[in-house]
Amino acid sequence: MAEKKIRNLNKKLEVVQKGFANGVATNFPLTEKQKEKMIEKATAAYAKFLEALDCDWQNDPNSADTPRRVAKAYVNDLWAGRYTAMSPITSFPSDGYDGIVIERNIPLTSMCSHHHQTIKGVVHIGYIAGEGGQVIGLSKLNRIVELFGRRGAIQEQLTSAIHNAVDKVTGGNRGVIVTVVATHNCVSCRGVKHDGASMVTTKASGVFRQNTNLARKEFFDSIKINNGGHQI
């Protein structure tokens, strides 16, 4: 029963084609045995990649286990959101609370789909439950960020994915707003090579879409983005 609930929840949240970098694996979710098999295949492939770059990884003591380390990092950490399902989300009656629920500075680790460089930053999430509606367990917002962050990503699409997931699990809400503030290693380590630049993206629905709405102002006043990309 629990496994069915997990599958139904994850099916509800996913909208991207399976197999895409920002989607889930074609046979999602993977069992531990399937993950180990994937790690073995990726290890062999990454070894060939290093050899193509004229890296003698087998005789270099600092690179001898690099192919497997990289494969494990992708499957278990960097792209874990593509392979591991999220647990069921617990919701509770709002008990008449009609204000904003805001969680600020949720840590984000993701990866640029273009160059496979890390994206690091924070996510701010706000929502207002509908009349007689439900609020969700606070840590579930963090888990949603992990689910969609731990895979290949374009920040604009990632912001939409997080917003849409929160919107679905807080059904009947009056509005959802998500702001992502992040730095991209593909900007600082290659190409233009600029350190310190951060990207800010926001997606809003319901009452938060109206610039004159006090709820929108309250959210942005609460997160107070400064030049460093974090709450003041």
Pin down the residues of each PLM region:
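A domain-level signal for the structural core that forms small-molecule/cofactor-binding pockets
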Residues: A2-I232
